[in-house]
Regions:
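Conserved functional hotspots at enzyme active or ligand-binding sites that engage polyanionic ligands
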Residues: 1-103
């Protein structure tokens, strides 16, 4: 699941694409996962990671993972798998998360 892009019913946000951040060995037995919202708006490179077409998103010309907009959602809120981040994109997301969270 980690690094996959899903359409998700995000509480208090509504339907939105998200990237799964929770590692697979933890996500499997849990009912909830941590996700980052995907947006069509560019932001600072320290928080936003541009993602390519293999992520499965077509609404905007460019899409970005917002590493500062994190949510924990029940796995039942995940509606449809759309795609997956490229390994280099996920490494950049991980780096940005360390900066955002001070890890």
């Amino acid at each position: 699941m980690r690094a996959e892009v899903w359409g998700c019913a995000v509480p208090r946000v509504g339907p939105h694409p998200v990237v799964i951040l929770t590692v697979n060995r933890i996500a499997e037995p849990l009912s909830a996962v941590t996700v980052a919202l995907v947006t069509g708006s560019a932001g600072p490179a320290t928080t936003h990671v541009r993602i390519g077409p293999e992520a499965g998103l077509t609404k905007y010309d460019e899409s970005y993972v917002n590493c500062a907009d994190l949510h924990t959602v029940d796995q039942s809120n995940l509606r449809r798998r759309l795609g997956r981040l490229a390994p280099v994109e996920m490494r950049t997301v991980e780096s940005n998360l360390r900066g955002v969270l001070g890890l």
